[in-house]
């Protein structure tokens, strides 16, 4: 009997193993009505009828299962018919994203559609769009594809239509942002619930020991014989097995409680994304949680195209964790690496030092060196890594060594330059080494009395084939040399022809090298003739030239150069150039050959020297400081295109440093190529150790024909080893490592390729991975086993043993000394306290001062306070207020020494006359500024209101021993003065800007990777691109400086006790030097002052200048000012006019859309509530999904929610908790660590409500109350001017805070401005950053216009360069507000008009340098009325 359709469906459900995962009604009543099979296309389409819709999660489970089951037979598809579609509307919305993904729409369109609101109307699905443009676009591109996708899932939908959503036309930006915020909060709440659920499940599993999975194993075992390289996967396949290492993991929970797992793996041939849905009632998730980045897995599954990312992925059916034996160093006796580059070798090294140290330790190496290019910035991390791994760290650097000056004249002779005879010559050779290559052409001209009097030109036969490179360079062919004489004959004839003339050559060291080598081989000995190098001569007498090549000089001197790189032509050109140079020397007072070097030498001679690489290894602690001095001088004093180390500098600070010969660009290696053995050994004696590196690292020299062949390379090794033996200097084999493993080479290639001018781009990069001992021994096998062991193992270990343990970073804080600081801080505190509170101080004041002074003085922090006090006093004396940041306002001593305006005592009254005071220390008042006005009961004077109720512990910790971090906000325009004042206080050599290190960011790395792949014509999957991006990320790219950090070195030490110094980004014109180390590395060793720049003090200063009002006299509780935080009424405008329910546009801290929405939700009326708003807006998970919900639900009001970190400690102490417990709770919550059981118990014992505990558990970061109070104080002062002195406010705002202006709109009437703002609100989601910045300005302009004020056009006669100025009830904008007009041009316009009015647009262009585009803009603005294009010439001007 044939099976029914329902029975068929049950069999299918059992076969694909979903019977226990779907609703039983579905299993019982579902029907498999038909299977359409196409043998030709190998496809099966299942026609299935279901009683009702599957949940979206169950739909994914079912379709994934059916695909997996039959994947080896056919490509599966399906079509559902749903019997009960009554709840179709609900399911359509949930399926919408899935259906979008199963269309051929672009990823961008898919992403846009997913954000849209849906409405089901009968059998029509309406997608609500933001505007008509968007509607038309979707109509065009979707083209019925969505209907098809929905019908496949069983939906009875006839069509999908796109309509403009009226509800999305928000009246103003605030409501738009409110809508977005509401959606974000919903998502955030859902995410939080999921996270808490995961945490709870994880904790439960741990408690019950339910999960013992320590190794991932899902599905069937995978046969190793089936493994394919990932690079071979280029199309969809039914069943593929791969192996790879994980470099990224993503677990995403679905609403059903299941997860989708995404792994990114690589086998270093390519990378691939692996995906799998976890199964219900299985421990799949536990297995996947056992995986981590760096583990190897073997996986099997179907390769299919992910339609969302348009890339191949594997849908896994089976996966197992496998063990891969890591690379090992199996040698019994290990080597020591002495030449290694980390990510601090700018755009060259790949891993950080920790990765190298970890590897060396695993291999059993006892020591490892770090030798980055020109810097020592890896030292701090190297120290930590070495201590952690128990390995000896050897600190070093690969630097650029230069001679202090390169001679212009060699072998000086007493010859008058005018009367001398010169032989100007040039050689063409088979290569660059005078030791291994030969002369093939020798040409010369003889010069006397400024005239060429004779010529010499000969070829010589090298008896070898010329390389293609030499033929192309010299234009000499083998045929031209076949019958040429021997070089011995040519040189003998040449020597006789030259006589005692002075040799002249361009880059004479090269040409003379070949002449001297040839002479010596003939037994003549080196030449005794004097020499002049025209290259070095030009560099000295033509310092204004950036180039000194023969082509360039010929052009500059007006000399014809007919065929460059043929000896005779080069020689004649050089001769004519030299004749003119002799005249230049005469004008400089140089007339004799022996005087050239002395009279033409200068302090910049080091710039002319060719740098050679040198390795500097720190041997002793003294050597570390000396290296810091060398590094500093090279970066500050001797920087020219690259940091340079003059030999004299190295000699001066060589104590405690071992000097090595470095790589193939070192002095010794070059000498072996260019000098005889005696000279090589003479040079070798300068060094403490000689380096040789694996032949593979020199392969590029052979590829570039700098070395003839491998045999020649082996000869070079022999000569180097011989030099070591004859001088007794140890020879060590070093690896010159730039990355850990061979497969990391691609990352270095990408970084090098991103630098077009890098010479390493000229050839194939050598293999520069971190080699094991056996790898190094194998590299040097050609030397024989004994010699290889000597240089690889024996000598490196002996050298390491000669090096002492060195500590590069101090282990304590060294603060500056200021005589009498303790006494002065105490005296200042009490003097100012008595000025405020009277001679008979209240006990609460005394107790607080003594408590704080005990900590400050007892822990040596007085000098830090005193420095800050001096800086603030200087700024105040110069007329600029200073705002405090961070928690310094928690210190009453800081208040009394005038470091901060925030008073942390409990709210209180003070009588300015009789000094009567009244404190409210029961928590009933949030801020003293909120106390009602009151007269003194004793003398009737109006009482001062003060106190923000902030505990001291939030600044220096519960024990008062935390180093104070005093951050100060100076006016941005005054900040440079404050910085420079530290030089007055401590001396110029004791203060430095805090240095930073900029590394390659992920986005930048992505650009490098894409650029490299495009240039190479390579296509890679997204997963492989992600891997390459990770490899490039984090490499040092540049250096910089902290925006306000100043490092202060104590007078009893110098900067080199802590760090080298440099200029930021090596900018030698910078006014400040910075620490070479990133300031975080020495944060605990030296004092850092945070002297930051901020707009608020600048704006306050401008408002004071305009109004004459002292900002300190502004009433903080002014009712009209306070009203703007809940309504625009006190501004004289309505919500409808300014499109906002508050009046805080442009008020610092309260002007953003996010905070304005908070104001609308909370309607604050007091200073303490504004402080709460500030704290809530700066915290993480403090407002959204937390305090906002509590306020909305009516559980508590704004004043009682947790806003700032200090609130927690104060609240809990008032509740009855011990101060220490209250402090610990505050610290735990503010750092996002939640609450411990001990804290929860203490809170419950003191009846702290549950909502308070729940709120604490959600918080990730909290803002300090002192910081919030300081910000709010500035904001209220500025708001006061906005309410009571509007034009002063608007002029100041536009001058100080605004940067992007739409003047064309700003000069219009108020309704036009308002309509422009409304239009931008309607397009807000499509606006770019610049447009949003313009919108912010137009919001304020709209408000200004509705208050009855107007913006004039730019005025050629009245506009200033930078400041908006007031004229009547209008503002006149400055020139800088014109889009595209820079600061220099703005200044130039003002300067030009002082010489008289502009007569025409042409005159404006000529005098002020305005472009035609800007002139047209000014014309459109109405700023050039009656100004003609050109000036008319009057008869009276004739």
From Swiss-Prot:
NCBIfam families: dnaq, polC_Gram_pos, PRK00448.1. This is DNA polymerase III PolC-type. One of its GO terms (cellular component) is cytoplasm. Keywords: Cytoplasm, DNA replication, DNA-directed DNA polymerase, Exonuclease, Hydrolase, Nuclease, Nucleotidyltransferase, Transferase. HAMAP family: DNApol_PolC (MF_00356). SMART domains: EXOIII, POLIIIAc. Belongs to the DNA polymerase type-C family. PolC subfamily. The keyword Nuclease applies. GO terms for molecular function: 3'-5' exonuclease activity; DNA binding; DNA-directed DNA polymerase activity. Required for replicative DNA synthesis. This DNA polymerase also exhibits 3' to 5' exonuclease activity. Gene3D superfamilies: 1.10.150.870, 3.30.1900.20, 6.10.140.1510, Metal-dependent hydrolases, Nucleic acid-binding proteins, PolC, middle finger domain, Ribonuclease H-like superfamily/Ribonuclease H. It catalyses: DNA(n) + a 2'-deoxyribonucleoside 5'-triphosphate = DNA(n+1) + diphosphate. Its EC number is 2.7.7.7. GO terms for biological process: DNA-templated DNA replication. It is found in: Cytoplasm. InterPro entries: DNA_pol3_alpha_NTPase_dom, DNA_pol3_finger, DNA_PolC-like_N_II, DNA_PolC-type_N_I, DnaE2/DnaE/PolC, DNAPol_HHH, DnaQ, Exonuclease_RNaseT/DNA_pol3. Residues 422-578 form the Exonuclease domain. The keyword Membrane does not apply. CDD domains: DEDDh (cd06127), PHP_PolIIIA_POLC (cd07435), polC_OBF (cd04484).
């Amino acid at each position: 009997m044939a099976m029914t359709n329902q029975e068929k469906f049950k069999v299918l459900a059992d076969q694909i193993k979903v019977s226990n995962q779907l609703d039983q009604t579905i299993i019982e009543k579902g029907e498999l009505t038909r299977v359409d099979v196409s043998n030709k296309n190998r496809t099966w389409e299942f026609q299935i009828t279901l009683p009702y819709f599957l949940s979206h999660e169950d739909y994914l489970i079912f379709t994934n299962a059916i695909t997996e089951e039959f994947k080896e037979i056919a490509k599966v598809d399906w079509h559902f018919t749903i019997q009960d579609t009554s709840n179709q509307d609900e399911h359509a919305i949930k399926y919408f994203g899935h259906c979008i993904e199963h269309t051929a729409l672009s990823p961008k369109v898919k992403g846009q559609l997913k954000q849209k609101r849906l409405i089901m109307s009968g059998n029509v699905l309406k997608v609500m769009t933001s505007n008509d443009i968007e509607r038309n676009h979707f109509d065009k591109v979707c083209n019925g594809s969505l209907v098809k996708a929905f019908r496949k899932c069983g939906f009875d939908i006839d069509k999908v239509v796109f309509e403009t959503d009226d509800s999305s036309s928000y009246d103003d930006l605030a409501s738009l942002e409110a809508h977005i915020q509401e959606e974000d909060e919903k998502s955030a709440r859902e995410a939080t619930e999921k996270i808490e659920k995961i945490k709870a499940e994880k904790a439960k599993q741990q408690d019950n020991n339910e999960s013992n999975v320590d190794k991932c194993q899902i599905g069937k075992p995978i046969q190793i014989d089936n493994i394919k390289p990932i690079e071979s996967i280029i199309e969809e396949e039914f069943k593929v097995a791969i192996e790879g290492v994980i470099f990224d993991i993503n677990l995403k929970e679905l609403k059903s409680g299941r997860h989708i797992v995404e792994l990114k793996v690589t086998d270093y041939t390519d990378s691939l994304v692996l995906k799998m849905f976890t199964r219900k009632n299985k421990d799949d998730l536990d297995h996947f949680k056992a995986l981590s980045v760096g583990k190897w897995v073997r996986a099997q599954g179907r390769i299919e195209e992910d339609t969302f990312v348009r890339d191949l992925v594997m849908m896994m059916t089976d996966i197992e964790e496998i063990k891969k034996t890591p690379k090992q160093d199996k040698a019994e006796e290990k080597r020591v690496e002495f030449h290694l580059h980390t990510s601090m070798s700018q755009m060259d090294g790949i891993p950080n030092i920790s990765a190298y140290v970890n590897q060396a330790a695993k291999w059993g190496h006892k020591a490892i060196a770090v030798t980055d290019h020109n810097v020592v910035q890896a030292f701090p991390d190297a120290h930590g890594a070495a201590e952690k791994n128990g390995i000896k760290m050897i600190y070093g650097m690969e630097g650029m060594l230069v001679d202090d000056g390169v001679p212009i004249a060699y072998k000086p002779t007493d010859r008058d330059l005018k009367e001398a005879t010169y032989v100007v010559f040039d050689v063409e050779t088979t290569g660059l080494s005078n030791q291994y290559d030969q002369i093939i052409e020798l040409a010369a001209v003889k010069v006397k009395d400024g005239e060429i009097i004779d010529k010499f030109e000969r070829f010589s036969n090298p008896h070898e084939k010329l390389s293609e490179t030499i033929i192309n360079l010299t234009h000499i062919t083998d045929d031209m040399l076949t019958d040429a004489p021997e070089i011995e004959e040519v040189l003998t004839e040449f020597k006789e022809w030259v006589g005692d003339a002075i040799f002249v050559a361009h880059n004479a060291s090269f040409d003379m090298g070949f002449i001297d080598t040839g002479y010596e081989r003939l037994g003549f000995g080196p030449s005794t003739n004097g020499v002049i190098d025209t290259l070095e001569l030009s560099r000295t007498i033509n310092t204004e030239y950036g180039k000194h090549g023969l082509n360039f000089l010929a052009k500059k001197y007006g000399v014809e150069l007919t065929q460059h790189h043929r000896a005779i032509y080069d020689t004649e050109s050089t001769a004519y150039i030299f004749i003119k140079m002799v005249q230049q020397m005469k004008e400089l007072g140089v007339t004799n050959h022996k005087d050239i070097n002395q009279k033409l030498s200068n302090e910049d001679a080091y710039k002319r020297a060719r740098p050679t690489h040198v390795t500097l290894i720190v041997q002793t602690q003294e050597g570390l400081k000396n290296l810091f001095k060398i590094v500093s001088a090279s970066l500050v004093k001797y920087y020219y295109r690259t940091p340079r180390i003059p030999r004299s500098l190295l000699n001066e600070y060589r104590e405690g440093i071992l000097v090595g010969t470095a790589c193939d660009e070192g002095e010794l290696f070059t000498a072996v190529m260019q000098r005889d053995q005696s000279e090589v050994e003479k040079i070798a004696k300068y060094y403490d150790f000689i380096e040789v590196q694996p032949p593979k690292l020199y392969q590029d020299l052979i590829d570039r024909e700098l070395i003839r062949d491998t045999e020649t390379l082996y000869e070079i090794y022999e000569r180097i080893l011989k030099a070591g033996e004859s001088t007794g200097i140890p020879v060590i084999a070093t690896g010159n490592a730039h990355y850990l493993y061979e497969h990391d080479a691609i990352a270095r290639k990408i970084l090098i390729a991103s630098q077009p001018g890098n010479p390493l781009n000229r050839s194939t990069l050598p293999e520069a991975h971190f080699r094991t001992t056996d790898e190094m021994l194998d590299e040097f096998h050609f030397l024989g086993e004994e010699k290889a062991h000597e240089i690889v193992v024996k000598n490196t270990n002996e050298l390491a043993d000669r090096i002492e343990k060195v500590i590069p970073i101090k282990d304590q804080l060294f603060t500056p000394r200021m005589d009498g600081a303790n006494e002065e801080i105490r005296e200042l505190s009490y003097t100012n306290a008595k000025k405020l509170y009277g001679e008979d101080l209240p006990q609460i004041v005394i107790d607080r001062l003594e408590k704080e002074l005990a900590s400050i003085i007892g822990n040596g922090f007085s000098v830090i306070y005193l420095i800050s006090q001096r800086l603030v006093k200087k700024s105040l004396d110069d007329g600029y207020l200073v705002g405090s940041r961070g928690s310094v306002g928690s210190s009453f001593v800081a208040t009394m020494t005038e470091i901060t305006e925030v008073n942390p005592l409990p709210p209180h009254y003070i009588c300015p006359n009789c000094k009567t005071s009244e404190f409210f220390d029961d928590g009933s008042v949030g801020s003293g500024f909120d106390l009602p006005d009151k007269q003194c009961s004793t003398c009737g004077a109006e009482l001062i209101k003060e106190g923000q109720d902030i505990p001291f512990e939030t600044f220096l910790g519960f024990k008062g021993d935390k180093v104070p971090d005093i951050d100060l906000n100076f006016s941005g325009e005054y900040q440079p003065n404050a910085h420079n004042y530290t030089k007055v206080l401590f001396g110029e050599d004791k203060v430095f800007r805090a240095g930073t290190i900029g590394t390659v960011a992920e986005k930048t790395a992505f650009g490098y990777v894409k650029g490299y792949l495009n240039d190479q014509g390579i296509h890679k999957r997204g997963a492989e691109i992600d891997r390459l991006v990770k490899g490039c990320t984090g490499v040092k790219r540049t250096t910089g400086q902290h925006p306000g950090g100043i490092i202060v070195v104590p007078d009893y030490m110098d900067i080199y006790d802590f760090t080298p110094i440099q200029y930021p980004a090596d900018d030698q014109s910078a006014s400040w030097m910075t620490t070479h180390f990133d300031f975080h590395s020495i944060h605990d060793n030296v004092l850092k002052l945070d002297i930051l720049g901020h707009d608020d003090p600048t704006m306050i200063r401008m408002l004071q200048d305009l109004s004459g009002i002292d900002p300190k006299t502004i009433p903080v509780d002014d009712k009209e000012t306070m009203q703007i935080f809940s309504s625009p009424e006190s501004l004289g405008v309505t919500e409808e006019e300014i499109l906002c329910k508050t009046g805080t546009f442009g008020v610092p801290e309260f002007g953003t859309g996010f905070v304005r929405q908070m104001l609308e939700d909370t309607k604050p009326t007091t200073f303490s509530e504004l402080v709460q708003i500030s704290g809530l807006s700066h915290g993480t998970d403090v407002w959204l999904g937390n305090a906002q919900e509590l306020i909305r639900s009516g559980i508590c009001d704004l004043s009682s929610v947790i806003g700032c970190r200090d609130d927690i400690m104060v609240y809990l102490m008032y509740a009855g908790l011990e101060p220490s417990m209250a402090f610990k709770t505050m610290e735990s919550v503010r750092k996002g660590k939640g609450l411990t059981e001990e804290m929860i118990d203490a809170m419950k014992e003191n009846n702290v409500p549950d909502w308070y505990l729940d709120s604490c558990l959600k918080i990730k970061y909290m803002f300090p109350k002192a910081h919030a109070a300081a910000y709010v104080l500035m904001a209220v002062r500025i708001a006061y001017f906005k309410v009571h002195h509007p034009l002063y406010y608007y002029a100041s705002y536009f001058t100080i805070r605004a940067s992007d202006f739409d003047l064309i709109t700003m000069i219009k009437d108020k309704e036009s401005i308002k309509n422009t703002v409304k239009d931008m609100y309607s397009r807000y989601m499509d606006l770019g950053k610049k447009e949003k910045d313009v919108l912010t300005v137009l919001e304020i302009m709209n408000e200004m216009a509705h208050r009855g004020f107007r913006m004039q056009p730019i005025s050629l006669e009245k506009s200033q360069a930078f400041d908006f100025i007031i004229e009547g009830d209008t503002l006149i904008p400055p020139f800088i507000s014109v889009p595209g007009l820079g600061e220099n041009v703005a200044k130039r316009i003002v300067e030009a008009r002082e010489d008289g009015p502009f007569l025409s647009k042409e005159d404006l262009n000529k005098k002020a340098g305005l472009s035609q585009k800007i002139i047209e803009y000014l014309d459109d603005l109405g700023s050039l009325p009656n100004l003609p294009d050109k000036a008319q010439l009057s008869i009276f001007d004739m």
